[in-house]
Amino acid sequence: MENKQRIAAAIAAQTGLEADQLRDWLETPPDPAMGDYAFPCFRLAKTMRKAPPAIAAELAGSIGHIDGIASMEAKGGYLNFFADKTAFVRDTLDRVLSAGDSYGDSDLGGGRNVCVEYSSINIAKPFHIGHLPSTAIGNSLYRIYKALGYNAIGINHLGDWGTQFGKMIVAYKKWGDKPVPQCTVRELVKLYVRFHEEAEKHPEMNDEARAWFKKIESGDKEAVTLWQQFKDLTLKEVGKVYDRLGVRFDSYAGESFYEDKMGAVIDELRQKGLLTVDKGATLVDLSAYDMPPCIILRSDGATLYATRDLAAAIYRKKTYDFVK
């Protein structure tokens, strides 16, 4: 039994009121010198037909020893309680040792779903220090939510789509000297850097890259195979880092996963009359919320990160019906 429960039980024994209600009325004093817990006796003034200071003094005189409480003091209309620090430390350590890894767990979440997105690495690029804060904080939140009784869903929203993969394919086909599965991510990065160096001298290479990405979009077997190999290689390498960090995910659905889901989002926005066109770009006007507009389609018809993010949020809500 915790201190608040013991205090509430002691007051209940003197007043005949419900301990649960009394516990809810307990407060934390603004100054530690005033105690660790404070009971506002004005709550009892109507029932006991006495002034709060008189009630506080009466309770202080009638309540005996309370386990975990060193002393109590009537102060104005409050009855202040001072915790027995030695007993508190001993009891806490006993609970920690007894509960082990489950210490602090609760059923607060009631099994409800919570989505936590973290790490979100880029394919064909190494895991670096910039990914570490999101990965560590996100995984901590994931574990905390699980301990609180939620069904946490860890999501690694991969950066696995875009013309950069067309560039990667061009670079690999020109200068790659072994099968992709035998490469390292750093070797892929070197090829990618070389592409940009060569493209400055030969701009037509950018057209090749766009053509290869178009092949990925259209499902060309060779293009999709290479793209998938880049993805598999990256996840294999970064998986070793995640294992060392004790990080896990339930979903690796990234940008590519939402490519075929953005059309429905755009249609829904249009049907609801939320889209406007400004200088060729299609956007949602958010001026009523004192926010800049959210661009959904560029003037050339291309989607943006915001478009994918909307598709991801809607998909996750429909799939997981998350509460957070």
Predicted regions and their residues:
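Generic start-of-chain signal for non-secretory N-termini
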Residues: 1-18
